[in-house]
Amino acid sequence: MFELFTALMLGILEGITEFLPVSSTGHLLIAEHWLGSRSDFFNIVIQAGAILAITFVFRKRVWSLATGLDKYSNRDYVMKLATAFLITAVVGLAVRKANWQLPETIQPIAWALIIGGIWILIAESVAKHLPERENVTWSVAIAVGLAQVVAGVFPGTSRSASTIFLAMLLGLSKRSAAAEFSFLVGIPTMFSASSYACFELFKRGELLHENWLEVSVAFVAAMLTGFAVVKWLLGYIKNHSFAPFAYYRIALGLVLLTWLT
């Protein structure tokens, strides 16, 4: 029963942190440090739950882009989404081939949380002095693609933080526009990464000993929580900055470093 409860808690944690600029991978690694580590498949599945949630949130936007390619603005936007995704895919595969491993200790995650928090504060400070723009440029698309790889390589960085705030610094200063592009790029990116990882685990026969009840509970928890969090966040950023998330990251990082010493 305790294992089922921890699976539920990890699913909720994934749903809360996946799309907030606080790093879901970092939080999961921290939680598993105390609750016990889970299989790669478990972590992949709960991330898939969060991805499904954001796909549902943006279903109308995705449909309008897919069915409106006769409009230049839609074609241009889709091409930039595709460019960001392809950059992530190519560079990400190269990193995977190099056998990059996630850290097994908390210290690098703590530092990534602190540095990421400072990064958010800098981006917010710079962006508020820029004219409000919501058009995605090619430089933003390329940078977002690379930022996704950085976030995957360094847990604690946060995919949403690295992509949203880099986009803001490069001129996409309207928070909602930067967040939308980040989230839409994240859909194919995370679906592809999850599918590839699942296929690799299947080939190695590592799916035979999973506790499917725990996996299912965590998946549903991540999906429902993720849906609620994204809906809340999209409303929140219309009139608020991301600064509170920055302070949270810095505080958590400092607490972890203090605990480690």
Curated annotation (Swiss-Prot):
Q: Which residues cross the membrane?
A: 38-58, 75-95, 106-126, 136-156, 181-201, 217-237, 241-261
Q: Which GO terms describe its cellular component?
A: plasma membrane
- Coarse class of the protein's main subcellular location: membrane
Where found in the cell?
Cell inner membrane
Q: Name one Pfam family in it.
A: BacA
| Gene Ontology molecular-function annotations | undecaprenyl-diphosphatase activity
Question: How does this protein sit in the membrane?
Answer: Multi-pass membrane protein
Could you tell me the keywords of this UniProt record?
A: Antibiotic resistance, Cell inner membrane, Cell membrane, Cell shape, Cell wall biogenesis/degradation, Hydrolase, Membrane, Peptidoglycan synthesis, Transmembrane, Transmembrane helix
Biological process, per Gene Ontology: cell wall organization; peptidoglycan biosynthetic process; regulation of cell shape; response to antibiotic
Q: Per its database record, what is this protein's job?
A: Catalyzes the dephosphorylation of undecaprenyl diphosphate (UPP). Confers resistance to bacitracin.
Q: What is this protein called?
A: Undecaprenyl-diphosphatase
Task: Supply the source organism's classification.
Answer: Bacteria, Pseudomonadati, Pseudomonadota, Gammaproteobacteria, Lysobacterales
